[in-house]
Amino acid sequence: MIYKVLFQADKTQSPLREATKSLYLEANSAVEARQLVEDNTPYNIEFVQELTGEHLAYEQESEDFKLTEF
């Protein structure tokens, strides 16, 4: 499954909606996706969302859509 992870780049600062970034990754569950990001980045994870169907197709049309591998 493909997940979209919304995050802040710095854990030491208060989250700002305007500074929220995203990455996409393939994992077996949302828990695994969160763990992969926590283990491999210094990011403050806000939300992990599974992408399926039309939502996945919409995200794949974006030029920012790239699967992250750790």
UniProtKB/Swiss-Prot annotation:
It catalyses: RNA(n) + a ribonucleoside 5'-triphosphate = RNA(n+1) + diphosphate. GO terms for cellular component: DNA-directed RNA polymerase complex. It is an enzyme of class 2 (transferase). Its EC number is 2.7.7.6. Disulfide bonds: none annotated. One of its GO terms (molecular function) is DNA-directed RNA polymerase activity. It holds the Pfam family RpoY. The keyword ATP-binding does not apply. Keywords: DNA-directed RNA polymerase, Nucleotidyltransferase, Transcription, Transferase. GO terms for biological process: DNA-templated transcription. InterPro entries: RpoY. A non-essential component of RNA polymerase (RNAP). Belongs to the RNA polymerase subunit epsilon family. RNAP is composed of a core of 2 alpha, a beta and a beta' subunit. The core is associated with a delta subunit, and at least one of epsilon or omega. When a sigma factor is associated with the core the holoenzyme is formed, which can initiate transcription. NCBIfam families: PRK13667.1. This is DNA-directed RNA polymerase subunit epsilon. It comes from Latilactobacillus sakei subsp. sakei (strain 23K) (Lactobacillus sakei subsp. sakei). The lineage of its organism: Bacteria, Bacillati, Bacillota, Bacilli, Lactobacillales. The gene is rpoY.
